[in-house]
From Swiss-Prot:
Induction: Negatively regulated by TnrA under nitrogen-limited conditions. It comes from Bacillus subtilis (strain 168). The lineage of its organism: Bacteria, Bacillati, Bacillota, Bacilli, Bacillales. This is UPF0340 protein YwlG. SUPFAM superfamilies: TTHA0583/YokD-like. Belongs to the UPF0340 family.
Amino acid sequence: MNELKQTWKTMLSEFQDQAELKQDQLFVLGCSTSEVAGSRIGTSGSVDIAESIYSGLAELREKTGIHLAFQCCEHLNRALVVEAETAKLFRLPTVSAVPVPKAGGAMASYAFKQMKSPVLVETIQADAGIDIGDTFIGMHLKPVAVPVRVSQNSLGSAHVTLARTRPKLIGGVRAVYECE
């Protein structure tokens, strides 16, 4: 577990170096703790793995002031666990469900228990996110998603994809994108 925590800490540090997350930005995590442990997604969730991943993100939140969203599994239609204040700030309508390990996933249910005032929302448009175990967070990212590459592309046995977003470049040949 110590190796997992160290890998995760390094991954988050490298991600922040590139994504440059700022206060009040929205971050989404999709995570299969089963995949991290080497099993097929949805088959053997782990509270211990969820705790390790959550603690790293809690540190990132403290350093940056970002808002965290934890994607549930497909049994809850990939709804997201957020703090009630996050839902209010981003004007996100809530939905009625409480994630549990077998319907929501180990990661989302762990996050729900750790938060001060957790709620579920159906969808968000996050500024950045990390997908651990191919949980498909793309539906919750703003357009345009930009891949972020870090020194490792796996956590435990799970494949990891990292992304930040950028504003759309609009206009034509005469458009200017940087101030002179």
